[in-house]
Amino acid sequence: IIMSADGYIITNWHVVTNEDGRAFDRIDVKTYDGTVYENAEVVGADQDTDLAVIKVGAAKLSPAQFGDSSGLKLGDKIVAIGNAGGLSWTTTEGIVSGLARDVYEDTGYAIKCLQVDAAINPGNSGGPLLNSQGQVVGINSAKISAPAYEGIGFSIPIKEAKVIIDDLIE
């Protein structure tokens, strides 16, 4: 999710780290217009909240518009964007189906997330969850993956994420 014109990008911790929790040696970023930015810098990453900020060498990116996740209600329409299964710019739609759900990451730390029924799959992580005005209201992060469950995805609310993101940048 492009945060600023000067190259700050929001994503998930688990997107920029390996199994040992260390940042990948090389992170390349491809934007919607096909431009590839090589060797992005990990500015900060927080395992407990599954958030990370990276920076690419750019001066004129088009940042996303950010909304207010605290105003979301059950049943609100949302859109999830990502690279599900390696398929670039996959877009799925759904509704907000839960608020402030505790999602436990590998650390055992609970992250308060929005529950959505839009398809969230491997490759969607770090992508935006948009409201009906096209504003980012969440960061796609996880899903329940079990044979008996379908359509239970989770997104970190942008209001809570912004506090962590600002700390990671400073």
List the model feature ranges, each with a label.
Residues I1-M3, E41-G44, S97, N121:
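Conserved positions in beta-strands of structured domains
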Residues M3-A5, N131-S132:
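A cytosolic small-molecule/anion-sensing beta-strand core signal
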Residues W13-R26, L61-P63, I81-I95, A100-G126, ...:
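Active-site loop architecture of trypsin-fold serine endopeptidases
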Residues S4-W89, K162:
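Conserved active-site neighborhood of the chymotrypsin/trypsin-like protease fold
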